[in-house]
Amino acid sequence: MDPTAGSKKEPGGGAATEEGVNRIAVPKPPSIEEFSIVKPISRGAFGKVYLGQKGGKLYAVKVVKKADMINKNMTHQVQAERDALALSKSPFIVHLYYSLQSANNVYLVMEYLIGGDVKSLLHIYGYFDEEMAVKYISEVALALDYLHRHGIIHRDLKPDNMLISNEGHIKLTDFGLSKVTLNRDINMMDILTTPSMAKPRQDYSRTPGQVLSLISSLGFNTPIAEKNQDPANILSACLSETSQLSQGLVCPMSVDQKDTTPYSSKLLKSCLETVASNPGMPVKCLTSNLLQSRKRLATSSASSQSHTFISSVESECHSSPKWEKDCQESDEALGPTMMSWNAVEKLCAKSANAIETKGFNKKDLELALSPIHNSSALPTTGRSCVNLAKKCFSGEVSWEAVELDVNNINMDTDTSQLGFHQSNQWAVDSGGISEEHLGKRSLKRNFELVDSSPCKKIIQNKKTCVEYKHNEMTNCYTNQNTGLTVEVQDLKLSVHKSQQNDCANKENIVNSFTDKQQTPEKLPIPMIAKNLMCELDEDCEKNSKRDYLSSSFLCSDDDRASKNISMNSDSSFPGISIMESPLESQPLDSDRSIKESSFEESNIEDPLIVTPDCQEKTSPKGVENPAVQESNQKMLGPPLEVLKTLASKRNAVAFRSFNSHINASNNSEPSRMNMTSLDAMDISCAYSGSYPMAITPTQKRRSCMPHQQTPNQIKSGTPYRTPKSVRRGVAPVDDGRILGTPDYLAPELLLGRAHGPAVDWWALGVCLFEFLTGIPPFNDETPQQVFQNILKRDIPWPEGEEKLSDNAQSAVEILLTIDDTKRAGMKELKRHPLFSDVDWENLQHQTMPFIPQPDDETDTSYFEARNTAQHLTVSGFSL
C-alpha cells in the first residue's frame, strides 16, 4: 500500500504505520487558529481578554504580547501565571484549558464565566450587605488557602480579579503577578494529579493535547519551531540582496515573482515572526528585520517596484499573525495588502492632519501597496499616501523617513521639504482611507486583529498637541477603534522618544533644545511624554540637513537601575530622569543605526511622520523663548492629575517604588513625579504595551555625554549586557518594582520587605471593607496618598447609620494588621464570629445571593459596569 495513504488513516489501527504511531504517541494541542473570536470582553494591565469559540464551546482567551513581557522584564510572570492556573484545580479558581502561543503572543484559553467580575457587580450594587459580602469573602478565602497550600501567592487580589460563575460562585483569575514557589518547570504529573480534592471531578480532567500545551515552553528564549521553512534560510535569503543599498535591505521580491508574491510574503513574515520570538537579543535580532521592511517600502527604486511586506510591524500592530488566515484564504491576492492596509489604516488614525479625502480611494492604495504594481501609476495624492504608509514601516530616524519621496524614490537626505509636503498630502487623504476601509473590516473577525492596542477617548481628548489636528484625528480614530484609540497614540509618543534615541547618536539633545524655540501654546499640558517627544521630534526633523551630533539617552545596566533621559540646556531646562523597568531598554552601541532599535520601534515612525507640520509651527532656530522653561515645567506637573484620573479608572498596575522621582538637572530645580499606575504606562509609554513607568522612552542609547549620566547608569566599555531573559536562575522577585494595585498593596510590599502569603490576606481585608462600604479603605486622590494611608493604616470607618457591625469591623481589623506575622489567615477567619454561619465544607453547593441571568451564552454585559467605570470601551475595539 502506498505509504502516503497509510499515513492518512486514522490512528489506532492494527497495522498503523510509523507515522500513525507517532501521531498517537505525540498528540498535539490545537492551534490558536482553531479558535474564532466572538467578541472582546475586557482588558487589563498585561493583556486583553476575548470571548473565543471552538467546536461550539465558549472560552475566555487572554492574549499577552511576548514583546511586552520581554521589554518589561516580566516573562517569568507570564510563566508564573500559566503555571499557577495549570496547577490549580479548585472550584474557586478559573480553570485553564490550553496554553497556546504564536511567535508574538501567548494565549491562555480559560473557562468563560458569564457572570462578569465582582467589581462590575459592586458598581451596580453600590455595596454588598453583610451576608453577601461574607459569602464572597469566604469563597475567596478558600481559594487563597488552596493557592497558599500549593506554594502560590496571588499578589493581585481585588474585586476585578474575582469572576462570577453561572451559579453565582466566585472564581479567582488573573495570576499575572502571582508568585509560584515551585522552583522548577511543571511536568505532566503536576497537571494530571489533583491534590486538592479527594475525589477529582470530571471537570478537572484534561485531554493529552491540553496537558501538552500546559507544560510546553512559552518560547521566550527559543524560536518557535512550527514553520515548515527554515527561518535561518529565509532570513539569509532576505539578506542576500542587501548590498544594493548602504545601511539598508532591498526587497527580495522582484517584479518577476508576482505570481508567488503572497507566498513569498508569508515566508518573509514567517522569518520575522520566528526571529521575533527569540528574546535572547530582542533588540539586535528583531530590528534588523525592521530595516528590511523599511527598505522594501521606502527605498525601492521605480524599476524594482514598491513592495508591501507583511513584517513584524503588522505583527506588532495586530499581534496574531496566524489569525488572518481566513481572510487570506478567501482572497489570496488581497491577503498581504489587507494586512498592510491595517497598518496603513492605523497610521491614518494617527495622522496629524486627518482631513476628509476626496481624490483617493482604497483601490488606489491597494494598487500602490501591491508588490506587483508600480507605485508610479498612482495619482499624486495616492503616491503621497503610499509614501507615508511606507514611512509607517520605516526604521530610520525621523528626518530620513520623512524625506522619502515615491516619485524620486531614493535615499537623498536633501529632500526633506518634499517629504514634509507629501506628509501633508497624506494627511489630506487620511480620513477617507479610514472610511473606505470600513467595508474591508467587515470580513470575518478573527484573532489576527486581537492585538491592536485600543485607547480611551477620554485620554485622547486630553492629547491636544499642536501637531495633531484634534477634531479630524478624532474622526479618523472613530472609524478604526472606538473608545480606546488614544492609548495607541500615547504609546506611540513614547516610542516617539525611542526614535529620538535613534537620533541620539547623531543629534545632541542639549543642542536640540538650545537651537530651537518652542512656543508655549505648542506644549499641551496633560501629557509629559507627548510634549517631550514632540520637541525632540521637531529638533530631529528641523536639523535634518545639519551635521548630526551626539545625544545622550542613557540606559541601565543593572536590574534595579533607572533609565534617565537628561535634557539640559543653557536655558535651564529641567533635567528629566525617569525610572524605567530594566528590560524595557536594551543598550545599544553609540554607532549603531536604527537597525538596532527594539521590537516596538517598527511603529516608531508613526508619531514622527504624523507630525510633519510640527516643524512649520516652530519658532526659528537659535531664538530662545523664555517661556519654554516655564512651559516645560508646567508639563511636569499635570501628569499627576492624569495619573490620578487613570488610577481611578483602572486598578491593575505595576508600580515602582513610590519614591521614584525626576532628578534635577544641573540648571534647574528638580521636578519630582512618582511613578504611578500601569494606566499611566499605557498612555505614555511604549507601543508594546504598558511599561511600568509614566513617561519613559523605549529606546536605549548609550551616550558619550558623561556629565548627564547618573552614577549607576552605565558601565563604561561594555556596549551590551546579557539580556535578563537568558540569564540562568530564578528571576529576582524584589527588583525595585512594586507589583499590584495601589489600594490593595500590603505595607511590606511598599516598604520593600520580603513578603509571603500574608499579602493576599491583607488584600482580602481591603476587599471585605470595599464590599461592605463600596470603596477601598485607603482610597485617595493619588497613589502616593494611598500609599501613605496604607502605611499609616488610616481607615475611615463608617459612622452613624452606616456603621459596620462589630464583627465586620473586627474581621477587617485582623486582616488589615500591619505586622504580617500577626495578620489573620484561614484559621483565624474560620474561628471569627463574622464567619460563624459559614459551611466551609459545602460552600460551593450553597445558593449564592446573585445568580447571573444572561440573555444568551455569549452575553458579556456583566463585564460592562467595570469597563464603563474604568472608561474601557471594549465593544468596538479591534474591529
Swiss-Prot record:
UniProt record, GO biological process: cell division; DNA damage response; female meiosis II; G2/M transition of mitotic cell cycle; intracellular signal transduction; regulation of cell cycle; regulation of mitotic cell cycle
Extent of Polar residues compositional bias: 706-716
Record localization: Cytoplasm, Cytoskeleton, Microtubule organizing center, Centrosome; Nucleus; Cleavage furrow
Binding-site list for ATP: 41-49, 62
N-acetylmethionine PTM positions: 1
Ranges for region Disordered: 1-23, 566-632, 700-728
Signal peptide span: none
Domain of life: Eukaryota
Phosphoserine PTM sites in chain numbering: 293, 370, 453, 552, 556, 631, 657, 668, 725, 875, 878
CDD domains reported for this sequence: STKc_MASTL (cd05610)
Sequence positions bearing Phosphothreonine: 207, 222, 519, 722, 741
Compositionally biased residues, Basic and acidic residues: 589-598
Keyword check for Acetylation: yes
Active site positions, chain numbering: 156 (proton acceptor)
CC terms in the record's Gene Ontology section: centrosome; cleavage furrow; cytoplasm; intracellular membrane-bounded organelle; nucleoplasm; nucleus
Molecular function (Gene Ontology), one example: protein serine kinase activity
Domain AGC-kinase C-terminal: 836-879
Record-listed E.C. numbers: 2.7.11.1
Processing and modification events after translation: Phosphorylation at Thr-741 by CDK1 during M phase activates its kinase activity. Maximum phosphorylation occurs in prometaphase.
Function comment: Serine/threonine kinase that plays a key role in M phase by acting as a regulator of mitosis entry and maintenance. Acts by promoting the inactivation of protein phosphatase 2A (PP2A) during M phase: does not directly inhibit PP2A but acts by mediating phosphorylation and subsequent activation of ARPP19 and ENSA at 'Ser-62' and 'Ser-67', respectively. ARPP19 and ENSA are phosphatase inhibitors that specifically inhibit the PPP2R2D (PR55-delta) subunit of PP2A. Inactivation of PP2A during M phase is essential to keep cyclin-B1-CDK1 activity high.
Similarity remark: Belongs to the protein kinase superfamily. AGC Ser/Thr protein kinase family.
Protein name: Serine/threonine-protein kinase greatwall
Gene: MASTL
